[in-house]
Amino acid sequence: MSWFSGLLVPKVDERKTAWGERNGQKRSRRRGTRAGGFCTPRYMSCLRDAEPPSPTPAGPPRCPWQDDAFIRRGGPGKGKELGLRAVALGFEDTEVTTTAGGTAEVAPDAVPRSGRSCWRRLVQVFQSKQFRSAKLERLYQRYFFQMNQSSLTLLMAVLVLLTAVLLAFHAAPARPQPAYVALLACAAALFVGLMVVCNRHSFRQDSMWVVSYVVLGILAAVQVGGALAADPRSPSAGLWCPVFFVYIAYTLLPIRMRAAVLSGLGLSTLHLILAWQLNRGDAFLWKQLGANVLLFLCTNVIGICTHYPAEVSQRQAFQETRGYIQARLHLQHENRQQERLLLSVLPQHVAMEMKEDINTKKEDMMFHKIYIQKHDNVSILFADIEGFTSLASQCTAQELVMTLNELFARFDKLAAENHCLRIKILGDCYYCVSGLPEARADHAHCCVEMGVDMIEAISLVREVTGVNVNMRVGIHSGRVHCGVLGLRKWQFDVWSNDVTLANHMEAGGRAGRIHITRATLQYLNGDYEVEPGRGGERNAYLKEQHIETFLILGASQKRKEEKAMLAKLQRTRANSMEGLMPRWVPDRAFSRTKDSKAFRQMGIDDSSKDNRGTQDALNPEDEVDEFLSRAIDARSIDQLRKDHVRRFLLTFQREDLEKKYSRKVDPRFGAYVACALLVFCFICFIQLLIFPHSTLMLGIYASIFLLLLITVLICAVYSCGSLFPKALQRLSRSIVRSRAHSTAVGIFSVLLVFTSAIANMFTCNHTPIRSCAARMLNLTPADITACHLQQLNYSLGLDAPLCEGTMPTCSFPEYFIGNMLLSLLASSVFLHISSIGKLAMIFVLGLIYLVLLLLGPPATIFDNYDLLLGVHGLASSNETFDGLDCPAAGRVALKYMTPVILLVFALALYLHAQQVESTARLDFLWKLQATGEKEEMEELQAYNRRLLHNILPKDVAAHFLARERRNDELYYQSCECVAVMFASIANFSEFYVELEANNEGVECLRLLNEIIADFDEIISEERFRQLEKIKTIGSTYMAASGLNASTYDQVGRSHITALADYAMRLMEQMKHINEHSFNNFQMKIGLNMGPVVAGVIGARKPQYDIWGNTVNVSSRMDSTGVPDRIQVTTDLYQVLAAKGYQLECRGVVKVKGKGEMTTYFLNGGPSS
């Protein structure tokens, strides 16, 4: 019966579930482990003891265009996951289980259910729904508190009206009972008082529960008083009143399911007990009690069918909203991490410009955009570690990366203190610029002080390691172009002839000395003592360019005094701040080094900076709940309605929102129709029990039953469509998925139930008893009273009619009203029908019923009942009256009570419909806003990751983003067989000139950008997926293959052949570029293979690189190569020759640091 479970089961779309556990599969091993043994990444801390690994939060669903290896990383780990805790919702499509960590998981219900399981699920329907987390349950109650408060206030007004109606019904006849009048007056006063209480600002959730139970107590008292005050008494007297009380207990009082069920059953039982005790001598007691039981059971069923889906929908909406907020916060947290990492690698102005270009779709241009800015009056410092090869040969991979990381992290700190911007780390070479991005007048002083500090730092390394290492520092002042080139693996860099000169100043310098040009000396203003540097004697370039150089001897006396005073001020500040700020450590978190203003400009709201420490201390669940709590406090229901929803119609003011809302599918629609069928069955049983049978009545009931059953079956196809023909599936989908069609079917079902409630009225005897008795007693019909009928020995319920006729007598028309009320209550089950639609339907049905009741033939049934009920009262009193002194009727005529009863029920039904629709629409609106914010965060995350993946390899970026708790860890890999390529444009330096005609060299860089972009596009091709671009160094392009398990082919060595193919492809591309740019660029490419160390150094500004003898030799293959040729080592020759590649021996070549080596030229790929 899967179609019926639609009522009991909250359908959850797997693609957008609010349960955090559905969308990800648990990873079988931690990030960083490899199946093979060639390359094992290690993460170590040089500053702290080892800590347990922090879990990676599960990512939310993402757009298809974000689908890449990094985004698809695993699911939730164990620990503090960002998953919603399960809520006990009774019947569901999924089993809710609890893991060892206490987190709820949801498993698909694919196993057939046993009878015991179905019974257990059925019992859960009647249980109160609540989240397993008490805090989450409190948030849910607060979430709906404002709506419940306004609904409770309106309910008090309806109950005041109800007490007024009851008072009028009781006081209108001649014999009102003071006790009952006093009871109703007190009840009305209490309801007014409670209405005032509900509107007070101090009204809280706990008070709402108290008010609800007080209302139930008052209703029970009114019900008892009404039964005792009934005159004449009857088991069906005032039957509509407990039906109304039971209905509002389920629908309008903000109480949980268990309390609603107990209240409904309690009120029903109370009326049955009173009817039994007060009418023991009634000949028709058990017949009417049986009908009453069916009537109350049906009312309770309607209440359950209304309360359960409404609460489940509300809780599901709350879950989904919380889920979107949770995903948004998670994405915001990830974006903040990405922004910090991004801004730690690229200057803010460059990163923002790139992000803006990604956000804005540009028209296709002839050239790729170049991100370059020109800066005059800067100083460039190049520093190289002399003796690094000796140091590296004595270190393991871990020790090498740790040493470099600590040393360059120290340099980064010194650069920040000396107002220098680190540009790049090239192996053991470090270079920075002062005067970027903001201009400084003392840029030369900053670089000189930076050089002094670097030499002091390397002396400490020399003392600790015992290895003779030192620094050569070269400085030049002039103009630079700064920015990034290419499409992938962006690295901020500087270019100009002055940068080239600064590089040669380092190469022509002396160990432990600072080598400067005259241009730099002029900016120093005599603050330093210098001596001739004679750089031309040590460097050919300096000699060719006739560069006059100097070596710094030390600061002048004036400069020493200024530095001493500055140091004293800094010590004073340090002493005053001691204990407030942490001491410097070499590898502090990059994620905490940037100003929040940059994050806001990049699209991340960092307004919570002041509370950052508190939020970092919260676990993810508590952070989501805290955010949701603040959002609930800030949310104004009245303002939301005013801004977005029309007051009476409850439709959205914006048509696009209304269209989106109308496309919402209610998967429980089949259950609503099934519930209407159940109400119809109860009505049939009541009428068969109370009223005489007729062939016409049975025929009508059979026809309605078939129509409703067919409707239910058609709607059920939507839940289990694969078992039915496709035409029937399409019909079912067209009904359930269309709000207009489902509304029409819902109204049709209610009309059928309504027809069953009134159809039997036309099969009863409509002859007025007054007319028959008047003929028998020779009186006018107006003179006939109950006493006259008593004299004729005719009373209520006699089968033999007083008047001649062929149609049966219907003695208890109160049950027609009861059935009519049930048919109206059945409309409340269809939660998807709009409140204005329900109001129109109730108005039309009520009008039809009143026209029949007041003007149609059935009116005589109610007149006859009022007269016979008086006879029944006289018989119960055992008194005899003649026709002249017969007592007046003790109650208002039933047909005049009916319009007022219908009005009270219509108000309650409309109030409930307004509450349901208003809640659904506001939930939809808030969820839509949360969804929009989440999607914006997803887009921002995608932009950030596209930028980030163009800077660091994906697994490296994953390390820095996922392991935020261990920001001081190192990342490195020892890889045993990696192919490395250096490809340089040998004559680009001849092409590069700085003239006004080419914008001081920018146009030359633009062409270089196009060349590198072409190389990047080629490396992005699928056949070169094993390759990883490392970086560009001026006009040299560096790439490698086999750096991780996914790209390393230990057996087939395909990663090596892929790099060889790429090198040949670059040669072809350079020929193509020369043809179209009318240039004659010549490329030299060097290839080598062997073990390398890959890792990241400088956690403040992480930079990925590879080191080792393999890298050095590959670079030498490029520098000692021949233009337009690809030079490879003997090791690589053996692999390529075995694969059929065409190579020729070049011979013996002298290689710096390696002596003589036999090399080969790669001429072509395998012959076909």
Swiss-Prot record:
Where are the membrane-spanning stretches? 152-168, 181-197, 214-230, 239-255, 259-275, 289-305, 674-691, 702-718, 743-759, 820-836, 839-855, 897-913
The UniProt annotation places Mg(2+) 2 binding at 384-385, 428
Reactions mediated catalytically: ATP = 3',5'-cyclic AMP + diphosphate
What does the activity regulation annotation say? Answer: Activated by G(s) G alpha protein GNAS. Inhibited by G(i) G alpha protein GNAI1. Is further activated by the complex formed by GNB1 and GNG2. Activated by forskolin. Inhibited by calcium ions, already at micromolar concentrations. Inhibited by adenosine, AMP and their analogs. Phosphorylation by RAF1 results in its activation.
Q: What is its EC number?
A: 4.6.1.1
Q: Does the keyword Metal-binding apply?
A: yes
GO annotations of cellular component type: cilium; membrane; plasma membrane; stereocilium
| Segments on the Cytoplasmic side according to the record's topology features | 1-151, 306-673, 914-1168
Q: What are the subcellular locations of this protein?
A: Cell membrane; Cell projection, Cilium; Cell projection, Stereocilium
Q: Which residues lie on this side of the membrane: Extracellular?
A: 760-819
Free-text remark on how the cofactor is bound: Binds 2 magnesium ions per subunit. Is also active with manganese (in vitro).
Q: Can you supply a Gene Ontology BP term from the record?
A: adenylate cyclase-activating G protein-coupled receptor signaling pathway
Q: In its UniProt record, what illness is this protein linked to?
A: Lethal congenital contracture syndrome 8: A form of lethal congenital contracture syndrome, an autosomal recessive disorder characterized by degeneration of anterior horn neurons, extreme skeletal muscle atrophy and congenital non-progressive joint contractures. The contractures can involve the upper or lower limbs and/or the vertebral column, leading to various degrees of flexion or extension limitations evident at birth.
Q: What does this protein do?
A: Catalyzes the formation of the signaling molecule cAMP downstream of G protein-coupled receptors. Functions in signaling cascades downstream of beta-adrenergic receptors in the heart and in vascular smooth muscle cells. Functions in signaling cascades downstream of the vasopressin receptor in the kidney and has a role in renal water reabsorption. Functions in signaling cascades downstream of PTH1R and plays a role in regulating renal phosphate excretion.
| Name of the protein in question | Adenylate cyclase type 6
Mind giving the lineage of the organism this protein is from? Eukaryota, Metazoa, Chordata, Craniata, Vertebrata
